[in-house]
């Protein structure tokens, strides 16, 4: 049936017919097979929406319709989905299926199977907790057992059953527990002590004794502080006992704004600091966050340092923050709690704008100040407070003593009988016996109370917290020490590593320099480089000499002694400065090395000058005897083996002087001192040339054993080869001096013929291992002198015959090398 739809303001509704049954297949995809099409179960009806619409021209009460302002209006025009055939709606059918029970095989549990009965299934198992809870804390003594036997006899005569010992112990324990609990409750509450509070008691915050409905005065059951509900922020008075904030936590804190403890206190936001509510109200910088609950205390950090520095005029303490007198000309400072205790005038003024102003006055400006003086009033006030406190304490102690004496009034027999499931008649006998026994023990309990009942639960928790804090603090200190030790150890190891690296670099540079000098053939003259190598060991040779050799060498040793002693006696000024040469290996080439000290160069020159005065010269090359000073100068610069060989040739010669020997003069050399060769080359090469000249002029005796000196020949040949070459080069540069005056020849002969009466010259700088004082001693009279040669020194200082012959042959072609060497 179609209904006429009134005109609607909707454009989309006018275009559509009023009622249309549209199949839901229009909004679905058509089936591929037309035979499979089924009738739709739902249709979209638009007449329901159109019937609800009201035209704009229709006047209707505004309360009877709703204005449709949704922008989703076009979607409403599509219609409402309704079933096509409501009569053919299928009815659901259901059936209940029983749950299938899962079958599981038995699996042995890891733990033992325990029975729920109190008796243990296994004889070895014991539950310690249950056993401790079931164990009675009271043990019967002999008096209790005797009284129990008498009671059982009386109960048997009266027709009651007997009481065993375990039952009596448990009954006495229950009586003690009830007495302890009721006594603690009586001590904590006002009713138990029976203290009647005075009517003139005042609030600890506002100091007002008045109370009104909804703002009653509340007392703390532990510290007995009195506060108004509004002053302390108590929204609802709890039933039973009430404790203040500090008593709830079981602490007795110190106020941060004054030196007093106790009273109506609240915490800061952190909960670590406490302050009196009165102090927070009277100090202008401090405020309270929530006025309804009067907590927490805030803005303590806003107090200026000048207020913290004030000293209280009443308690004379510089603790906390003080307030000052409201009189502008007065600057007297005092604590808020000190002002309350001394009865100063503290006014609270309410302005018209509901603003509260606090006015405080000192002793001088207070209107209700006492007539007594300040000192007298202070002593009087202290006396009154101490008296009131003592009276209050004595009253409380008296009430406690009365409560302890009347302990039996705190226990009800009916409650004990109900808990023990016994008759009141039987429990009454045990109750009377317990009362008599406790009175005989000065009203002390028969069993000690438990630690939880004696100390409470709050205080041990607080102590445990402080203990843990101390433990963590000590742990942090220990960890800090460990960290410091680890840092110091790491720093020490780093320093050691850097030091080792520096030493390694130094060693590497030293080795590099030594390798460079070795490859270039330079001498190791640096003290730091020489410290890396130790000097070669000293070699001492003991040779056996035949008697004929010592006899043949008399003349030679005599002449040698003359030559050795003549420089020391003729030139004493020169003997003070003996040349010192650095150590050199045998195979070192003769080169100008810049590291030689200047002193050694000059000493070599002086040695060459003094040596030229004592040498003889002829046209043919003949062996010459060197001076003792030359050996002393070279003893420190040659190896020990070479020194022994050269020194032996001096000590043991052929015993003959050349007939044509002449004393050389140095005048010609001094005249030609500024020749073609520079002073630096002269001073560095003269010392090497002297040794080469010595080796060429030394005769070699044929009666020395070859077997003892064979190992010296090879090294001596190499040294001679290297020393002869610079001598040849110097031969072409310097001309020898042949003109010698007759006066100088005569002076030289006198020196040769002069007998030596003392030992040979020795250096005063130190010990010389190459020349012994007994090597050149002479004994005799007149021109004939018999030398005394030690066997040990002669054996040590004789070179081989072959080496001396070869050296003499090589140096034979250079007759003027010695004179050129003196430059």
From Swiss-Prot:
A zinc finger (PHD-type) spans 200-250, 310-366. Residues 549-562, 781-809 have a biased composition (Basic and acidic residues). SMART domains: PHD (SM00249). The modification Phosphoserine is found at residues 566, 578, 608, 774, 776. A zinc finger (C2HC pre-PHD-type) spans 252-286. It holds the Pfam family zf-HC5HC2H_2. Residues 8-20 have a biased composition (Low complexity). GO terms for biological process: regulation of cell cycle; regulation of cell growth; regulation of DNA biosynthetic process; regulation of DNA replication; regulation of DNA-templated transcription. Residues 1-40, 543-585, 601-631, 651-676, 756-823 are annotated as: Disordered. GO terms for molecular function: zinc ion binding. Scaffold subunit of some HBO1 complexes, which have a histone H4 acetyltransferase activity. Belongs to the JADE family. This is Protein Jade-3. It comes from Mus musculus.
